[in-house]
Amino acid sequence: MDYLDKYKFSCDNPEEFGIDIKKYKKQNVLDESHISDLLSHSIRITKDILPKVSKSINRVFEKLEIENQFNFFVTADSFQANAACSLISLSSKPDIILTSKLIELLSAKELEFVIGHEVAHYVYQHAMYPNYQNEENRNLKLNILNLSRAAEISCDRIGFLACGD
């Protein structure tokens, strides 16, 4: 993963904002239940079921020069275009969930950006970062929001790598 580390935004580090992530360990219970619910209404993406999406997934991992260690799912959602990466999994692999609306709306390149972005959340272990909604201290809440923005910049950089020529 060293190859992708050079693209990580310099502020994508909890210490930059005085945040001790050990204090927040396993705080993402709400997120985990949401992901579990999504997965219960999802199907695994395979080359037989969604060949174009499967091809985009393969291109992303070729461009990022990393092994595909993920489970990919599509969940039925005709209203919301969204994607998520989960560290909790039905197997030993992390899960990336794409909504059917997202797949419907995006071109192959745009989908590759989103997949790369979600892969980066896993690579950079952003699920370990605290959720600002669980913080009462206003200054710490603002710092967590700033950390979240920095994390999104890191993931967008990988997204651009994933969809670039």
Language-model features, listed with the residues they occupy:
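Short pre-active-site segment immediately N-terminal to the catalytic Zn-binding motif
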Residues: 48, 97-113, 146
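Hydrophobic or amphipathic, alpha-helical segments that drive membrane association/targeting
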Residues: 1-87
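Divalent metal-coordination and catalytic microenvironments
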Residues: 57, 98, 117, 155
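Short alpha-helical functional segments enriched in proximate histidine and acidic residues
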Residues: 60, 121-122, 158, 162
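Catalytic Zn2+-binding segment of zinc metalloproteases
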Residues: 109, 118-134
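Short, conserved phosphate-binding/catalytic loop or strand-edge motifs used
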Residues: 94, 131-139
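Metalloprotease/metallohydrolase-associated module, dominated by Zn2+-dependent proteases
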Residues: 141-165
